[in-house]
Every structure is written in C-alpha cells, then in structure tokens.
C-alpha cells in the first residue's frame, strides 16, 4: 500500500522530507536458513556412495545397448546429466546421425527431436509431417496415444520462429491433453500432463523438475534401481551443499544488517538464492553462485531505493557517485542511508575482487560497468516518475531494457565461472546477441505484467504496459495480450541461438536460458512472486532447500 512518509533528518538540518514509501511484507523465513546443522560424516558417506553409483552407471548402463532415448531422457529428468556430460554428448551424436525417418512412433520421434534440438543439434521439424492427414491436420488417431501427445507437446516448445507445424502441434496437443486431464483424472499420466501443461520442460527449472520426476520414476515398474538410488542420494547431497551455501550468505546478510539499515527494501535473501540456484546448481559453480546472489541482493536494494524510497535529489547525487565509483564521494552523500548504501556497494565489490585471480578481474570490471549502466537507467525512470512523464514504448525500452537488470546479472553470472568465460565471451555479450535481447525483453515484459497489480496500488514508474496502452490507444487487457504474444516469440528466438555451431560455449548460453526459466516461475500468470511471495514460490523453495527425499 502506498503512502507518504515524512522524515525529520538531522543530516538534512532538520528539513522535513516527504518521500514515497511502499510496504513490503517481511521475510517469511526468519532465521530458518541462518544455521547449517548437518552431520558432515553422514554427508561424506552419502557422497562416497554417489561416486560409487556414478561409476557403476557409467560401466553397466551407459556402456550397454540400453534404450538410448529413454536413458538420456531419464538422466536429464532425474537431475543427473551433469555427472555424465561427455557420455550423453556421445549418445546424442550417435542419435543425430542415425536413420530414424522410418520410425512412426510419435513418442519416440518427438523425444528424439526434443533431446537433439535442446542440445543444439540440427533436426528438422518436417519429421512431424508424417503424422498429418491428407487435409494437413494432425491425425485424429493420435488422440488415443497419450504418451505420444505428451512427448509431442514437450517437443513443440523447442520451436523456431516461423515453424508453423510446431505451432500447430502445440495447439493440437494442448487441446487434447487438457481434455484428458479433465475427463480422465485417474489416467496414469494425468499428473505428468498437469505438470507439463503448467510448465513445459523447456521452461522448467532443472532441480525442481528432478524433485518431481524422481517420484514419477520410482512408480514406474521398469525403473532402474541404481539410477533411482543415485538420483535420490544426489538430490539430498546437493541440497545439503546448497543449504550450507545459503547459511553463509544469510550470515553475510545478517552481519551487514541490511534489513535494519534499509528497512524500506524487500527482505528476500532466501528467494534470491533460490533464483540464482535456478541459474546454476552444480557444485563447480559455487563461487559464481555466491557472488551473484550477493550482487542480486544489492541490486534489489538499489531497485527499491530508486523505485520506492529515494527523492529525486538524493538519487541524482547517488547516481553521480556510483558513476565515479570512488569511496571519497561518500562524504558528499546525504542523508545517512545513501552513505551506508554507497559504502556497502563499494566494499562488496572489493570483497569480490579478493575472491578472484588477477587474470579474472577484467570480468568483474565488465560487470561493474553494467552495474553503473543499470543505475543510470534507474535514475532516468525515477526522473520520468518525478516529472509525470509517460514515454513512447520505444523510448521506454531503451531505458527499461537496461533497468530490468537482466544484462547486468548475466554479465555478473559469468564472473565466477572460471576459465570457460573469456574476453571473447564478454565481447559477444557486449554486441547484444539475439538470445540476450530476446531473454531481456521477455524478462522486461513478464516483470511488468506480473508486477502490474501491485504497482497500481502506488505511484509507480511507467511500465511497458502503460506505454503500449498510450502509444496504440488500447486497453490494458489488449496491451498485455500483445506483450504476451511477443514473449512467445522471444522463447523461439532463444531456441534459435542454441543451434550448433554456437558462437560461445554451450554453458554460457545455458545460463541465459536458466535465467529465463526463473523469470517464468517468478512472474508467470500475471503474478509477481518475488515482491509478494506466494504459495507456488514457497513450495518450490521448500522442495529444493527444506524437504529431503526419503531414501
């Protein structure tokens, strides 16, 4: 709820300042994640068993003539693929050159298509033409092939712009899968179908799906006991690893007294760690994950300072100081909270420098320049609000493209990723490639649509929805409908940039895709789960960071 807070500040010679404030609900987690209480001895035993099982799987399963499609799919869905990257790559290469044109099994054809395309292999969508009738429609006989429909539905989300056959496949499968759920709730696949209709695999956060699929796989009579044991143990071991990380970050948050020093800002440290966990969960990215979580936490405070608390004069001073990035600027900042913020920002980046090797510092400098850029964008938006100015959509996007923070966060996500990120990577990023622009605009639109209900409760910065309504003279409903259409197109453009050969290594692109998946979870269905933590987000955090899997 918006209100005006009047402050008497000794730092401002007892001036009375009227400032907009927004009431954000406090953290729903309290100190739950502050302490890490897990037996290290028990964890070591589990890790040793995981390593044993990995070797067994490599020797007995991956080296056999097992059903390759099913094996790859299970490894990925169970969250185990990061242990078998080279083995899966070899299997996919074999699948890509094999002769499968005579296969008329809808499930297998769709699965092969999805597995290859999501890994960047070139595979034509024309393979689905054989499932159409003489009128050009998908055959009615396919309606009874439920597993085939579900497989085709998942494959259709890997479409490129202009692939009408996959658009038709999505419409066809969605219609009939919804009917199956509505009319056959006891169907063996009904739970999987409901989950897929809610969030298809292409948009699903990998660890969340692993948690869901392990229970599905266990009920499958044909499941491999070794794979199931490995999946459960590995999930629990990773959960312990992540909880330990989170406790470190929570102590950092607590020791800096962010909640006390910036009471006007959202206290969402757990949600932010979950956000970054969706970007990369693997143990080898621990350094990158912790660094990025701290940066996104600082960014959230910055966003709330510019959007919901600071006066235009204060923000102008802060913006200029950030551009100089010099601790000597701190004395010129008034009131006290600005000095506190500025000191924390500069000291945090100094801490990051100490964690990096000398030859890695150029990555942090690049990320720092992106932080300066986002601050300039925040100030421009604050100026619009202060002047009551509603820009045209194209003018708005020149600023809000930056202010959504996406490019800065992607750049920062690369800082701690060790040698795979090079000068060439950052040069690629600086040229704003299609996958970056598509994912950034997708993020911008979903954020604006999702946070619209809350923003309307206060005097807020103009959104892309507002600008679209003004520029095209349409209703709010029509504007949102059009922006959602663009979101669909952006997903297709993201898919296109995974086609091999890629300009940058695959893990670089995966970070962008994973950021987009998290955005989909936080803002889908026109809701802002970050500002107002809802049931869906809480349950997701419970699943990954609280509830272990019974062995």
UniProtKB/Swiss-Prot annotation:
<dbReference type="GO" id="GO:0010333">
    <property type="term" value="F:terpene synthase activity"/>
</dbReference>
<feature type="binding site">
    <location>
        <position position="447"/>
    </location>
    <ligand>
        <name>(2E,6E)-farnesyl diphosphate</name>
    </ligand>
</feature>
<dbReference type="InterPro" id="IPR036965">
    <property type="entry name" value="Terpene_synth_N_sf"/>
</dbReference>
<dbReference type="InterPro" id="IPR001906">
    <property type="entry name" value="Terpene_synth_N"/>
</dbReference>
<dbReference type="InterPro" id="IPR008930">
    <property type="entry name" value="Terpenoid_cyclase/PrenylTrfase"/>
</dbReference>
<dbReference type="GO" id="GO:0016102">
    <property type="term" value="P:diterpenoid biosynthetic process"/>
</dbReference>
<feature type="binding site">
    <location>
        <position position="307"/>
    </location>
    <ligand>
        <name>Mg(2+) 1</name>
    </ligand>
</feature>
<dbReference type="Pfam" id="PF01397">
    <property type="entry name" value="Terpene_synth"/>
</dbReference>
<feature type="binding site">
    <location>
        <position position="455"/>
    </location>
    <ligand>
        <name>Mg(2+) 3</name>
    </ligand>
</feature>
<comment type="function">
    <text>Involved in sesquiterpene olefins biosynthesis, constituants of cannabinoids and terpenoids-rich resins. Catalyzes mainly the conversion of (2E)-farnesyl diphosphate to gamma-eudesmol and valencene. Can also use (2E)-geranyl diphosphate as substrate with low efficiency, producing minor amounts of myrcene and limonene.</text>
</comment>
<dbReference type="InterPro" id="IPR034741">
    <property type="entry name" value="Terpene_cyclase-like_1_C"/>
</dbReference>
<keyword id="KW-0460">Magnesium</keyword>
<comment type="pathway">
    <text>Secondary metabolite biosynthesis; terpenoid biosynthesis.</text>
</comment>
<protein>
    <recommendedName>
        <fullName>Valencene synthase TPS8FN</fullName>
        <ecNumber>4.2.3.73</ecNumber>
        <ecNumber>4.2.3.16</ecNumber>
        <ecNumber>4.2.3.-</ecNumber>
        <ecNumber>4.2.3.15</ecNumber>
    </recommendedName>
</protein>
<dbReference type="GO" id="GO:0000287">
    <property type="term" value="F:magnesium ion binding"/>
</dbReference>
<feature type="binding site">
    <location>
        <position position="451"/>
    </location>
    <ligand>
        <name>Mg(2+) 3</name>
    </ligand>
</feature>
<feature type="binding site">
    <location>
        <position position="444"/>
    </location>
    <ligand>
        <name>(2E,6E)-farnesyl diphosphate</name>
    </ligand>
</feature>
<feature type="binding site">
    <location>
        <position position="266"/>
    </location>
    <ligand>
        <name>(2E,6E)-farnesyl diphosphate</name>
    </ligand>
</feature>
<feature type="binding site">
    <location>
        <position position="303"/>
    </location>
    <ligand>
        <name>(2E,6E)-farnesyl diphosphate</name>
    </ligand>
</feature>
<keyword id="KW-0456">Lyase</keyword>
<dbReference type="InterPro" id="IPR008949">
    <property type="entry name" value="Isoprenoid_synthase_dom_sf"/>
</dbReference>
<feature type="binding site">
    <location>
        <position position="447"/>
    </location>
    <ligand>
        <name>Mg(2+) 3</name>
    </ligand>
</feature>
<dbReference type="InterPro" id="IPR005630">
    <property type="entry name" value="Terpene_synthase_metal-bd"/>
</dbReference>
<dbReference type="InterPro" id="IPR044814">
    <property type="entry name" value="Terpene_cyclase_plant_C1"/>
</dbReference>
<comment type="similarity">
    <text>Belongs to the terpene synthase family. Tpsb subfamily.</text>
</comment>
<feature type="binding site">
    <location>
        <position position="307"/>
    </location>
    <ligand>
        <name>(2E,6E)-farnesyl diphosphate</name>
    </ligand>
</feature>
<dbReference type="InterPro" id="IPR050148">
    <property type="entry name" value="Terpene_synthase-like"/>
</dbReference>
<dbReference type="Pfam" id="PF03936">
    <property type="entry name" value="Terpene_synth_C"/>
</dbReference>
<feature type="short sequence motif" description="DDXXD motif">
    <location>
        <begin position="303"/>
        <end position="307"/>
    </location>
</feature>
<feature type="binding site">
    <location>
        <position position="303"/>
    </location>
    <ligand>
        <name>Mg(2+) 1</name>
    </ligand>
</feature>
<feature type="binding site">
    <location>
        <position position="307"/>
    </location>
    <ligand>
        <name>Mg(2+) 2</name>
    </ligand>
</feature>
<feature type="binding site">
    <location>
        <position position="303"/>
    </location>
    <ligand>
        <name>Mg(2+) 2</name>
    </ligand>
</feature>
<keyword id="KW-0479">Metal-binding</keyword>
